């Protein structure tokens, strides 16, 4: 209990309320995978690649902590289909991993990949924004 909030009781109450709603119609296994895929698309190919070979210790603590939080949230099944909103605070910490690319040539290449992915998504997906 910190500042009057019991995390365990809150998790149990949230799970009960969530299961009483539309969550019963959403398959857990599908969202365990698709949430992570959507997060990967949101952060882009450069971030996914940077996380794969991240060795810089201070950055690893930030990005790794955000990644651990995302995995725990995903395994709790409390974020089915809500990744774009619920996990948004983790995105900047994950993107920090791209600052550790070895040299300027790598950074430019991955920046181009990020740009291409963003343009492709914007062309393929219809968005009201």
Regions found by a protein language model. Give the residues of each.
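Membrane-lumen/periplasm interface segments of specific transmembrane helices
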Residues: 1-52
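Hydrophobic alpha-helical membrane-interfacial segments at the cytosolic entry of transmembrane helices
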Residues: 1-4, 68, 116
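Hydrophobic/aromatic-rich transmembrane helices and adjacent perimembrane loops
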Residues: 35-44, 82-102
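Hydrophobic, aromatic-rich transmembrane alpha-helices
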Residues: 40-63, 67-74
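Membrane-interface junctions at the ends of membrane-embedded or membrane-associated helices
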Residues: 50-57, 98-111
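Membrane-interface catalytic loops of GT-C/OST-like multi-pass glycosylation enzymes that act
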Residues: 74-90, 126-129
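Signature aromatic-anchored transmembrane alpha helix within multi-pass, membrane-resident enzymes
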Residues: 103-127
